[in-house]
Amino acid sequence: MEGLETVGSALLTLGLVAVAVALSLYERLDLEKDIGIAVVRSFVQLAAVGYAIDYIFGLESLVAVVLLLAGMVGFAAWTSSRRARGVPRALPVAAGAIGVAAVATLGVLLLLGIVPATARYLIPLGGMVIGNAMNTASLTLARVRDDVTEQRLKVEAALALGATSRQAVSPILKTALRNAMIPLIDSTKTTGIIFLPGAMVGMIIAGADPLEAARLQIVVLYMLLGSVSIAAILVGLLSYRSFFTARHQLKVDLSKG
């Protein structure tokens, strides 16, 4: 690709990072360290995954692809659980939701013959699914935790009137699910008008036909809508139970599973 054939040419964009650091210093935002860590980590991680994917492409092994995707699910679940501190059993909940979303979404694409079972398709598409499911899981877990804590009296009042734990937190779950899914829905609505998505841009820059890029992007968008919906609903249904006892009583300490 002309202009991006070497690592050095990509590193020239560090000038833009310098602008961000300068603005942080000028406004005293105290974000210089975070920006520096983000830049270094992204470089190392992308370089490492680039070599790893290149190696897996050479193997042409479906087992290696599955193992890589499983590792991505595990790391995504760990990241999501860290963002949702205070939610009992957040790690297994996130892992289950993200894993099911990935398997279900990619499974449908494979069964319908939309994409071939090759590393070139499964790794990037799987990464998109897992990444978006991770963000959705994080948002849902955090929102359920915060709302159950803030609306404790309302939940206990509903329980006192004979509601089950599911009925008592139903409004909370609906709000959490809507807030987790709306960003992607809005993004999908404005695709092609306000911005061009990453997959389409990448293909066009790489020299692909714009119509072919548009077709793939449509697949990606619908795939992400499905995976995000699955992840959000599973996280909501699995997480709220950990705040209650077997007798449908709200736990005194919500952080304990």
Residue spans of the language-model regions?
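C-terminal ends of transmembrane helices
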Residues: 21-33, 75-86
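Glycine-rich helix-loop "coupling/hinge" segments at transmembrane-helix boundaries
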Residues: 192-220
